[in-house]
Regions:
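Intrinsically disordered, glycine/charged-rich N-terminal periplasmic/extracytoplasmic linker segments
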Residues: 50-53, 57-61, 65-84, 90-96, ...
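Bacterial N-terminal signal peptides that target proteins for export
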Residues: 1-6
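Hydrophobic alpha-helical targeting segments used for export or membrane insertion
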Residues: 7-12
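C-terminal motif of bacterial Sec signal peptides marking the signal peptidase cleavage site
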Residues: 14-17
Length: 244
């Protein structure tokens, strides 16, 4: 038995020794390049690691606005997208990515992401012949008028009270607590085509929304936002003077 075990061990050693050099694990060369994370400037890599989780791997289909939507890219200029990417949007799920705002990306990397989004997905003629509402609201909307605008342009999908119909609820407190008024405005203007939500031109055929319509319906939606999203809490968690 001992002799057989020795012969088996020798055979295994011989087999291993016959392996090619390429098949054996080797230490990387001393001069092998190691790229620091801050020096990576490949768009596909940066987008996949920092953007795809919320905005979708191809700029659409994610929980957030589609960065690959040509209509969005036609109304939002590079300075706007850069500011949002660098500094984030307070009180929403959009974090800051720039190092100067507590993120991990350099200014050069943010420029690479913006340039890649623009070159890959923008279409110069996306709004040819159209007159879209401006990205930013020129003036505050009126929630009372907004209720009427909602009834005309939105209720057929989201229900008469906004709590859902063919499409999901648009007055859900948790949703409204996670988006800014600007996000609501942008979504109303550009829609979510991958989810079946039309842009400002196609809610009512032949009657596109005006900038005032958009501002008013956003004001109405914002008025539905709870002061403290997530409440009411269970009475078991409440105590005199506040919430545990």
């Amino acid at each position: 038995m001992i002799r057989q075990a020795i012969l088996l061990a020798v055979a295994l050693m011989a087999t291993t020794a016959c392996g090619t050099r390429e098949s054996l694990p080797v230490r990387p060369p001393v001069d092998s390049p190691v790229i620091p994370p801050s020096k990576i400037v490949d768009f596909s890599f940066l987008y996949a690691r920092n953007c795809a989780g919320c905005h979708g791997p191809d700029g659409k289909g994610g929980a957030a606005i589609g960065l690959g939507d040509p209509v969005y890219l036609a109304i939002a200029d590079d300075a706007t997208i850069r500011r949002i990417t660098a500094d984030g949007v307070p009180r929403t799920t959009m974090p800051a990515f720039a190092q100067h705002s507590g993120g991990m990306l350099t200014d050069d990397q943010i420029n690479v992401i913006i340039g890649g989004i623009r070159s890959r997905w923008a279409k110069p003629d996306a709004l040819r012949g159209a007159d879209p509402p401006p990205y930013r609201a020129p003036s505050p909307g009126d929630p009372r008028r907004g209720a009427g605008v909602y009834g005309i342009y939105c209720s057929s999908c989201h229900g008469a009270d906004g709590r859902g119909g063919r499409a999901s609820s648009i007055v859900d407190g948790s949703y409204l607590g996670l988006v800014s008024d600007q996000t609501l405005r942008t979504t109303v203007i550009v829609g979510r085509p991958e989810l079946g939500a039309p842009d400002w031109r196609d809610d009512v055929p032949g009657k596109p929304m005006t900038s005032e319509d958009v501002s008013d319906v956003v004001a109405w939606l914002a008025a539905q936002r709870p002061q403290f999203p997530g409440q009411p809490y269970s009475t078991a968690l409440q105590f005199r003077g506040g919430v545990r």
